[in-house]
Amino acid sequence: MPELPEVETLKNSLKDKLIGLIIENVELKRDNLRYKLSPLLATEILNTNILDVRRRAKYLIIDFNNDYSLIVHLGMNGRFTLQSANYKTQKHDHVIFDLSNGEKLIFNDTRRFGMIYSFKTDLLEKEFFNDLGIEPFSDLLTLEYLKDKLQTKKIPIKNLIMDNRVIVGVGNIYASESLHLARIHPDKSGNDLRDDEIENLIKAIRDVLTKAITAGGTTLKDFVNGDNKPGYFTKQLKVYGREGQSCLSCSSTIIKIKHSGRSTFYCKTCQYS
């Protein structure tokens, strides 16, 4: 599933190319996504000018000059890409946006876990994103904030940092990588973390996400940015997907366990605490 770095990469690849363009036509090809496409999508942003392309958590947001925004979630393997005017429609294309420069913006999702909505811009934070926590790069993510969130939680720290009500966008890959960098065992209870461990974890999350964004995200199978290019952070993964291989820091064997049905990778030597 695309996580924060992948959506940030997608945003970066589309922003400069989309701002200023007009949506000249919206074609709803298949409405059988996780949440059925609303027919209003074809009219609410028609003939509107694109003002901005941004990200909130794992959502891509496109703002228009009629005070509506398009909200896109890629689900498990959705793609949101720019294509030329002579693009031939594919089987799993769900929405096609015709742009004023002749290009097309395509939402394609083979597994249909993605979603795409139009929503009033000024109501997004209050009504659509009201349950989301703090962005990892926000100044609000401090020792005091995270300590307050963790102090009563007797559940594994990996689960806690993947909770979008606490910190947004830290998915399975980057949770394993961040805990390895911070040298914290993924099973350790959140309320058992010392202040210095919490500070190290915040720094590790930011460092890992920054490197992943710089590398264009992680493509394990399906992810591509708006230009159809994969991410290359896969080559920098220290523990994720490396079960049975040697730790790149200490040569111990990488171990795989499960948290809430998700695979977790760690080094028992480096992550002793």
UniProtKB/Swiss-Prot annotation:
Binds 1 zinc ion per subunit. CDD domains: EcFpg-like_N. DNA binds at residues 92, 111, 153. GO terms for molecular function: 8-oxo-7,8-dihydroguanine DNA N-glycosylase activity; class I DNA-(apurinic or apyrimidinic site) endonuclease activity; damaged DNA binding; zinc ion binding. Its EC number is 3.2.2.23, 4.2.99.18. A zinc finger (FPG-type) spans 238-272. SUPFAM superfamilies: Glucocorticoid receptor-like (DNA-binding domain), N-terminal domain of MutM-like DNA repair proteins, S13-like H2TH domain. InterPro entries: DNA_glyclase/AP_lyase_DNA-bd, DNA_glyclase_Znf_dom_DNA_BS, Formamido-pyr_DNA_Glyclase, FPG_cat, MutM-like_N-ter, Ribosomal_uS13-like_H2TH, Znf_DNA_glyclase/AP_lyase, Znf_FPG/IleRS. Keywords: DNA damage, DNA repair, DNA-binding, Glycosidase, Hydrolase, Lyase, Metal-binding, Multifunctional enzyme, Zinc, Zinc-finger. Its cofactor is Zn(2+). SMART domains: Fapy_DNA_glyco, H2TH. Disulfide bonds: none annotated. PROSITE patterns: FPG_CAT, ZF_FPG_1, ZF_FPG_2. It catalyses: Hydrolysis of DNA containing ring-opened 7-methylguanine residues, releasing 2,6-diamino-4-hydroxy-5-(N-methyl)formamidopyrimidine; 2'-deoxyribonucleotide-(2'-deoxyribose 5'-phosphate)-2'-deoxyribonucleotide-DNA = a 3'-end 2'-deoxyribonucleotide-(2,3-dehydro-2,3-deoxyribose 5'-phosphate)-DNA + a 5'-end 5'-phospho-2'-deoxyribonucleoside-DNA + H(+). One of its GO terms (biological process) is base-excision repair. The active site is at 2 (schiff-base intermediate with dna), 3 (proton donor), 58 (proton donor), 262 (proton donor). Monomer. Belongs to the FPG family. This is Formamidopyrimidine-DNA glycosylase. It comes from Rickettsia peacockii (strain Rustic).
